[in-house]
């Protein structure tokens, strides 16, 4: 009887040991999950977000706005550009050293031809935080005086300050539009005759040459 009780006791002990060993092997996975949700240290965040050259995908049309007759493949390219934060709101991240890089891009002329050619792009190699440039010139105070000339000058200065605040024609495709700085009116760079020469139609909403609707 004592032998039987002793055997049962050791069997239970062995089962408990095996159960514990199984959970011990699974423990590294739990630690790995905790590591994946680890809080990023302040200095790591600071260094990675500070003003520096970083790879950015840039739209080719942004660099070559006048070549609207082409379709580029790929439509964007990876370039090193200055980006990041500065310690003061009065400062901005600007390039202090630049270089050119040449890439092979496919140029496609719809219904005509396509070829792979070389295109040059600007890259930033060094960046610094420098004082922001004042983009709006301070308006000069008009001298008090009589006459139509003084009134015309005052009207002109008021009109200039208003024209600075024109909303852009299109955020994504600025290169396809032309904006009158005085009236803020947007018009297409492409013309109807230019599109028809390529057997296309001018889309006045997007200012692109599209295939004719049937």
Swiss-Prot record:
UniProt feature, compositional bias: Basic and acidic residues: 131-142
Region (Disordered): 131-159
Domain of life: Eukaryota
Subunit (UniProt): Homodimer; disulfide-linked. Also found as heterodimer with PGF. Interacts with NRP1. Interacts with isoform 2 of BSG. Interacts with CD82; this interaction inhibits VEGFA-mediated signaling pathway.
Function according to Swiss-Prot or TrEMBL: Growth factor active in angiogenesis, vasculogenesis and endothelial cell growth. Induces endothelial cell proliferation, promotes cell migration, inhibits apoptosis and induces permeabilization of blood vessels. Binds to the FLT1/VEGFR1 and KDR/VEGFR2 receptors, heparan sulfate and heparin. May play a role in increasing vascular permeability during lactation, when increased transport of molecules from the blood is required for efficient milk protein synthesis.
Name this polypeptide is given: Vascular endothelial growth factor A
Primary location: secreted
Listed Basic residues bias regions: 143-159
The encoding gene: Vegfa
Pfam families: PDGF (PF00341), VEGF_C (PF14554)
Keywords tagged on the record: Angiogenesis, Developmental protein, Differentiation, Disulfide bond, Glycoprotein, Growth factor, Heparin-binding, Mitogen, Secreted, Signal
GO biological process: angiogenesis; angiogenesis involved in coronary vascular morphogenesis; apoptotic process; artery morphogenesis; blood vessel development; blood vessel morphogenesis; blood vessel remodeling; bone trabecula formation
SMART domains: PDGF
Free-text tissue specificity from the UniProt record: Expressed in the pituitary, in brain, in particularly in supraoptic and paraventricular nuclei and the choroid plexus. Also found abundantly in the corpus luteum of the ovary and in kidney glomeruli. Expressed in the ductal epithelial cells of post-pubertal mammary glands. Expressed in the ductal and alveolar epithelial cells throughout the whole period of gestational evolution, lactation and involution.
Gene Ontology terms: cellular component: adherens junction; basement membrane; cell surface; cytoplasm; extracellular space; membrane; nucleus; secretory granule
GO molecular function: chemoattractant activity; cytokine activity; fibronectin binding; growth factor activity; growth factor binding; heparin binding; identical protein binding; platelet-derived growth factor receptor binding
Glycosylation sites: 100
InterPro entries per UniProt: Cystine-knot_cytokine (IPR029034), PD_growth_factor_CS (IPR023581), PDGF/VEGF_dom (IPR000072), PDGF/VEGF_growth_factor (IPR050507), VEGF_C (IPR027928), VEGF_C_sf (IPR036841)
Record Gene3D superfamilies: Cystine-knot cytokines, Vascular endothelial growth factor, heparin-binding domain
Record-stated family: Belongs to the PDGF/VEGF growth factor family.
Localisation per UniProt entry: Secreted
Signal peptide location: 1-26
Disulphide bond pairs: 51-93, 82-127, 86-129
């Amino acid at each position: 009887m004592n032998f039987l009780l002793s055997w049962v006791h050791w069997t239970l002990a062995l089962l408990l040991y095996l159960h514990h060993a199984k959970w011990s092997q699974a423990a590294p996975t739990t630690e790995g999950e905790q590591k994946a949700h680890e809080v990023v240290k302040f200095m790591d965040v600071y260094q990675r977000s500070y003003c520096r050259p970083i790879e950015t995908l840039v739209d080719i049309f942004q660099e070559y706005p006048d070549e609207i007759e082409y379709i580029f493949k790929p439509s964007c390219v990876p370039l090193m550009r200055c980006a990041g934060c500065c310690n003061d709101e009065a400062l901005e991240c600007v390039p202090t050293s630049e270089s050119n890089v040449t890439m092979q891009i496919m140029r496609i002329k719809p219904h005509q031809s396509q070829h792979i050619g070389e295109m040059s792009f600007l890259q930033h190699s060094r960046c610094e935080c420098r004082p922001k440039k004042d983009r709006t010139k301070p308006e000069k105070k008009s001298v008090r005086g009589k006459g139509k000339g003084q009134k015309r000058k005052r009207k002109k200065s008021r009109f200039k300050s208003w024209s600075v605040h024109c909303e852009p024609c299109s955020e994504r495709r600025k290169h396809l539009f032309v904006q009158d700085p005085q009236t803020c009116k947007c018009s297409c760079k492409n013309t109807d005759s230019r599109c028809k020469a390529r057997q296309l139609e001018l889309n006045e909403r997007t200012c692109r040459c599209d295939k004719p609707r049937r």
